[in-house]
């Protein structure tokens, strides 16, 4: 049986661009099954050590000396399409020290862009502890309740998104 049948598939790359695995989102929200599905864990693919979008974002993260972290694949894609390229995703999982180590190779500044719902706030708070423990500077930018970086950005220009991120990002400490 095709593991990813009826799903949009997102290739997940290493920092060097090698395809390590896939994430997939169900197309029909009516089905009673997991919304997201990933490649099985293996020696090559370990979700907790990978950041979605890192291969495409790494140069801009280093250039701008800041990394935006979002929750999901579509958040990364939408922001990249709008021109905000220094964005990666924790792929819906809590941030890990391995993921932060990847970012630390590029910058010491992280801005968390998580959903405006309770789960997003909780994920942000958990991630902040790991980022601070790793010795990085952390800022937080929240979105209006019910919005995530993807939905917020859909009808906005690059300039509007950039202004929002600059005006609503707050140093955590």
PLM features: residue spans?
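Short, hinge-like loop/turn segments at secondary-structure boundaries
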Residues: 106-107, 128-130, 155-162
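Short, solvent-exposed loop/turn segments at the edges of secondary structure
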Residues: 3-5, 105-107, 133-135, 144-147
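Flexible glycine/proline-rich, aromatic-decorated loop/lid segments
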Residues: 100-103, 129-131, 166-172
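Conserved acidic, small-residue-rich alpha-beta core segments centered on
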Residues: 123-134
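Phosphate-handling DNA/RNA-contact segment within nucleic-acid enzymes
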Residues: 1-106, 110, 123-124
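C-terminal or mid-to-C-terminal helical accessory/interaction module adjacent to the motor/catalytic core
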Residues: 136-173
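Conserved protein kinase catalytic domain
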Residues: 34, 38, 128, 150-153
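Acidic, metal-coordinating catalytic cores used for nucleic-acid/nucleotide bond scission
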Residues: 74, 95, 114-124, 142-147
């Amino acid at each position: 049986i095709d593991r990813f049948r009826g799903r949009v598939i997102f290739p997940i790359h290493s920092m060097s661009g090698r395809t390590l695995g896939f994430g997939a989102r169900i197309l029909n929200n009516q089905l009673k099954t997991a919304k997201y599905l990933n490649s099985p864990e293996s020696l090559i693919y370990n979700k907790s050590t990978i950041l979605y979008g890192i291969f495409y974002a790494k140069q801009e993260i280093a250039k701008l000396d800041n990394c935006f972290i979002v929750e999901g694949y579509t958040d990364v894609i939408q922001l990249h399409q709008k021109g905000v390229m220094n964005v990666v995703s924790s792929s819906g999982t809590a941030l890990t020290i391995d993921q932060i180590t990847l970012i630390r190779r590029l910058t010491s500044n992280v801005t968390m862009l998580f959903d405006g719902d309770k789960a997003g706030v909780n994920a942000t708070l958990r991630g902040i502890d790991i980022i601070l423990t790793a010795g990085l500077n952390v800022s937080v930018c929240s979105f209006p309740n019910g919005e995530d970086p993807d939905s917020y950005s859909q009808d906005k220009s690059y300039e509007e998104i950039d202004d929002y991120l600059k005006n609503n990002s707050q140093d955590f400490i």
